[in-house]
């Protein structure tokens, strides 16, 4: 299991050091520790120091770019993740579950962020006592323990520890929650207004050939839920999943044909740990008791019948050796009543470009020499519209034989619908103990489709 | 609020000040001081001098202060064991505290203090805490047992904590179960033999129930533990799989990977015919693909594991090529791994897409990545024959870019392509030669030199090119030196007249001026060969090279199976067994996949069925010999080339005319050679007569086994024998026999797929052999060979292939290739398949020849227990093309005079003596006369085989 956890700043100085096992640190270090046990450094501390230094020297101060997130130095393995300029490193001498260690490091970042916001050197120094407390709680002898902030916040706070003034009932409530089946939610939450927000966030990825043939396209989506619900509400989420719709439609043939069109085929999905997976596996129903506040309910991936919000039609003509003519048409492909936002088209230019002249019908376009691209920005664009840009690119004559590789034209945008076609059908809330019903809950649903890597070759 | 100030105190006398503050009466001040101490400790300052003062602060109601003191204690207790005892009382008291959080804190911290004296006091509180009413305390105590075991294993056993821990597996609280499982698993690792976890269907059921209820981390512990269980049969395996599959939808990638591990392992036990098996395969692909949308570090772990899964079960992800396409902003470690998997998944179906991608990657910026992409193009060419041409042209385009490292990498892979497809793409050599000057890496230089040497006859200025390398011979790396030596020797053998000086130069450089033993040895070998027997030298140095395998970097199957058991762990990331990076005995228990249950596949014995690889009997992986030692390798693999014993040839060190004698015969060997006798060595002429003595005694054993009945229409056909057992060929079993019918020879093969995957892309090749046997047509296996399917093929053979004397004479070395690997085996063919139809000699001719052949070439044999009369024998032999020229009766014995001719024109004359009237004597006597006496033994064996069947 994890032998120790260290947090460094960008210089490689240690901000947090928590050692769980004394096997970390090389054998050499152990020898020298014995040797110096009467000296100024106590043995165990020195060993850990050794691992700490090994990572600094070999990874943080390494001249080369990081070639692997897992490094083995003298039979000691170091896992690291980086958040802005802070390094988090987990150290072990055993054959640990590597995926678990990384998941834990991410979780650790989430927990810290939930307590004090951005992970920065200053914030870490300001909260070091809190971090040690958290590390003591969520990692015991290197085994990850309950790390849900909802539960942790009941007894570890930035203001110090609550539990000393708690009643016995409160204490046992804390412990049963931390160890219980629903570790992510505490009991006794109350809201005057029961409200929930659902965001369907999708990023649509495309690679298209110059002729308009789709080489690859997929949507990766997330359903993010923000819940402000009292008690321990039982929720059931429904969407237009093809498998569910077809199953339900079996009874009435009419409905199948009607709803069949609107349903979508989901390639794969994963769920937050609150979702009962066995139920999803057997009935494909998504039921759960949500954590309080914001969390990611599910992630999914689709590859079929994707609505591509924009089509890019490029035309590049080489006029002699020193001139390029580029014409790019973009067409919006969704309901005219909807508006796309933050549209940006990036047209790469050759390295030996000396000057560019651009004319565009809509928005603003600029040649950015430092980025070797023409950047065309349009604030808003309605559906079923089309716009065009033409540019003349002057080139410096070069004797470079290497042909310009013509990188693809990329696009960014945001649209108010889900390109996968996913629709939330319902989100039912039941709280049997409290006196509010599904109808009393105010629900909000929002769809945002953003461009992922949306490229057209030219 | 701003704790960062604690980090900034660096003034002198700090310790003294802290001491005063720690002993302050004010609570707040104390707490501040302890915080300062912890901050100093964190940045690496030694604050152990404050030990007594800090421990004094322990007795407090303030939980925060208490935790800080505990943190200090954990770090320094070991250095001050005597003082640490001071803390014991507080711990023991805290373990009785009404607040469960404090009880847990005390037992958790005590376990972290690795001082023997303290551990003694720990036992009682721990025992209580293991049975605490509060689950939070119990789950903490469970982990504490593992801590204590790490300090003092004996104590844990003596105190019976292991049993208590086992009881906790049945606890009502899922988190307690999970921690108990984690603790037990770790303890069990250090006691491989003790059946600590004692997994049985009941406990497995409990674990599976807890699996649904515990935290994500607990699920990982439980799944990792489940993976160590060995279900008793396929039904149990299936039911566990069914209950584990829902985990594939978990958001935590580690849960998914651990579930994949359980499924991959238990799948081994399921029969492939089951519907469920197919369903499971289908279910595995989407979650693996989804792992690729996780954070980059996890993607890396996932990709390393997918790399293993793709090797073990290629069918899972064969349609998912696109998701492994590299994204522009992937970190380099993700890019390199994706590339690796892309090559593994490349097939005829997707090769166009893959190539287009690889071409894009070759223009990226990261040098390592670009190199790997270029190399990948070469690997595609070798793997997918149909794409070879396109790959080569892509590589040529890349060479045109003149980017130094791209050119060098391209040359290295083109060398491999030449090896794989000889005489196909040599037209590009000219382009390669243009880039000679830009090569500065040893591997590329060596590759280029290999190409120049190998194709010396097509490169007009090969001698100049090689000479240019020779100038800086001693500054080159060893691989370049070795290659240069070999290349120049090759050149010399091909163009002996112009290059004599060059070869002497390189030989003396290698043998006299070099300290490298490898180089010297190789130099001497060539030298001796060239000076004693240039013809043999030619056969050695210019011998045909073994095929290179299309799949490179494959993990050895036993290791792969072991790594599959370690999916998700560091071992799977490093692709090394834990013993390679874990110290001591911990966690190095050898794991292996479960055996397939005997009920599902009765044909295979349970020991060999599961992975096909019990230790010691694993199939040999012959990796691509992409290295440049091709010639030497061939020397090792090939038959011994006989020449005069070395003792007779004195090595003339440094003699200028060391090649004097050899050169003539060498040049004479080439038809256009100047001078020299026009002596063409017959295939067997190079073999001294003394080697013709009884050889191949194994052959008779082989035929003793055969008892089937041959067909009468053609020559005798032996029943099929197993030539290549499945175990040695990753599941491909080959058996076969040879037939001769109406003048055509064929090899009747029976291919059986005993592996778990479909086999395709079969091809066959023979090594050079004594009679030039070679496939007359490619091996045609029309449909892919599914598991457990058998196909029968008749492969027509010709006798126009390259000739090389084998030992024994009728030995045939065969290489069979399929989509998995290349396999080598050798077999002995019966000589009678080489007896041609026009082997009947005219009487006069027979007499003349009989007299003409010297008597020492006559060999006598006895064929025992063969009660045939002359007519029967004669007709039997005739059907196998042994013709009776004359028959005589002398003193009651029938004498048959017979003749036969081999495919290479060698005549064999025979006298067969039969005693028909004497039932007590059923032995036949056979005298054979032949100009090539070494065939006699085999002709005799052919006689025996034909007559006795």
From Swiss-Prot, chain B:
GO terms for cellular component: AP-1 adaptor complex; cytoplasmic vesicle membrane; cytosol; early endosome; Golgi apparatus; Golgi membrane; intracellular membrane-bounded organelle; lysosomal membrane. Residues 594-611 have a biased composition (Low complexity). GO terms for molecular function: clathrin binding; protein kinase binding. Keywords: Acetylation, Cytoplasmic vesicle, Deafness, Disease variant, Golgi apparatus, Ichthyosis, Membrane, Nitration, Protein transport, Transport. Residues 584-625 are annotated as: Disordered. InterPro entries: AP_beta, AP_complex_bsu_1_2_4, ARM-like, ARM-type_fold, Armadillo, B-adaptin_app_sub_C, Clathrin/coatomer_adapt-like_N, Clathrin_a/b/g-adaptin_app_Ig. GO terms for biological process: basolateral protein secretion; determination of left/right symmetry; heart development; intracellular protein transport; kidney development; melanosome assembly; platelet dense granule organization; vesicle-mediated transport. The modification 3'-nitrotyrosine is found at residue 574. It is a peripheral membrane protein. Pfam families: Adaptin_N, Alpha_adaptinC2, B2-adapt-app_C. Transmembrane segments: none annotated. The modification N6-acetyllysine is found at residue 318. The keyword Signal does not apply. It is found in: Golgi apparatus; Cytoplasmic vesicle, Clathrin-coated vesicle membrane. Gene3D superfamilies: 2.60.40.1150, Leucine-rich Repeat Variant, TATA-Binding Protein. Widely expressed. It is linked to Keratitis-ichthyosis-deafness syndrome, autosomal recessive: An autosomal recessive form of keratitis-ichthyosis-deafness syndrome, a disease characterized by the association of hyperkeratotic skin lesions with vascularizing keratitis and profound sensorineural hearing loss. KIDAR patients manifest ichthyosis, failure to thrive and developmental delay in childhood, thrombocytopenia, photophobia, and progressive hearing loss. Low plasma copper and ceruloplasmin levels have been reported in some patients. Belongs to the adaptor complexes large subunit family. Adaptor protein complex 1 (AP-1) is a heterotetramer composed of two large adaptins (gamma-type subunit AP1G1 and beta-type subunit AP1B1), a medium adaptin (mu-type subunit AP1M1 or AP1M2) and a small adaptin (sigma-type subunit AP1S1 or AP1S2 or AP1S3). PANTHER family: ADAPTOR COMPLEX SUBUNIT BETA FAMILY MEMBER. Subunit of clathrin-associated adaptor protein complex 1 that plays a role in protein sorting in the late-Golgi/trans-Golgi network (TGN) and/or endosomes. The AP complexes mediate both the recruitment of clathrin to membranes and the recognition of sorting signals within the cytosolic tails of transmembrane cargo molecules. This is AP-1 complex subunit beta-1. It comes from Homo sapiens (Human). The gene is AP1B1.
